[in-house]
Amino acid sequence: MLLFRAASLLPLLCFTVGAFPFMDEEGSGSFAQEVLHSRSYPLANAHRGPFVDLPLFRQNRRKISQNFILHSDPREHMDEEALRRKLVWESAIRREKMRSHPDQVLPIGQDALKRSRCHALPFIQNVFRKNCFPVRLPNKFCFGQCNSFYVPGWPAGLSQPCTSCAPSRSRRISLPLRCRAGHLAWQEVELVEECECETRYDRNTVEPAGSGEGFLPVS
C-alpha cells in the first residue's frame, strides 16, 4: 500500500523538481530578481496566468516584454495611408473655416491715426435755475477731431461704430443756488477733467446736466 502511494506521488515530485530546481544563495538571489523584474510589467504578464515565473516561460518572457508597447496616441494605430487622409481632411476643414470667416484688414496708416485729437479746454459755465440766481463755475469741455469709419456689409442688427470726443475722467458735484424768498436749491453739475476719443456702438444722446444751463467759453 505504501509502495503504491509512493509510486503515485513520484510523477508529481519530478514535475516539482523540474519546475523549481534547487538553488544556492546566488541562485536564490537571481530568482528574486526575476520575480521583481516580472512585477515591473503587470500589464504584459497579466494575460499569461500564474506560471509566468516557471523556467519553461523564462526564455520567452523577455521577447514578450520587448514587444509590449503602450499606445497613447490613436494615430499610432493608423496605417500611413489612413493617417495621410485624416491630415488632408483636417487641413480642408481649416481652409473652409477661413473662407467663411476671413480676417478683414483695413488700410489705415499711422499718420491718419495721429490726426485724431481730443482735448479738454477750460471755460466758465453759468449754472442757473428758474427763480434762482446764476452761479459762475470754472469747468472744461471736450473739443477735437476724432477719426470714424463706416464698413459696408456690417452685420444686420448691429449699430455702426461712432467715434466722438468725450470725457474720459469727470466727476459730479451738487452746487447750491440761492433762490428768491430765501430758498436754497441744489443743482447737480458734471466737472470734466480729461477728454479723449472714444468709440460708441449706439445712438444714445447725453442730455446736459441741469435744465437751463448756460455756457460761456473763455476767449
Curated annotation (Swiss-Prot):
Pfam families in alphabetical order: DAN
Induction statement: Down-regulation during the establishment of embryonic left-right axis could be due to translation repression involving BICC1 and DICER1. Subsequently transcripts are degraded in a DICER1-dependent manner. Attenuated DAND5 expression lifts repression of NODAL and defines leftness by induction of the left lateral plate mesoderm NODAL signaling cascade.
Statement: the UniProt record of this protein carries the keyword Cell division: no
Gene3D superfamilies, per the entry: Cystine-knot cytokines (2.10.90.10)
Protein name: DAN domain family member 5
Keywords attached to this entry: Disulfide bond, Secreted, Signal
InterPro entries named in the record: Cerberus, Cys_knot_C, Cystine-knot_cytokine, DAN
Transmembrane segments: none
The organism of origin for this protein: Xenopus tropicalis
Function: Plays an important role in regulating the left-right axis by blocking a tgfb1 cascade in the right posterior paraxial mesoderm. Functions as an inhibitor of bmp, tgfb1, nodal, activin and wnt signaling in the ectoderm. May inhibit mesodermal signals, probably through an inhibition of nodal/activin pathways. Seems to regulates cell fate specification and competence before the onset of neural induction.
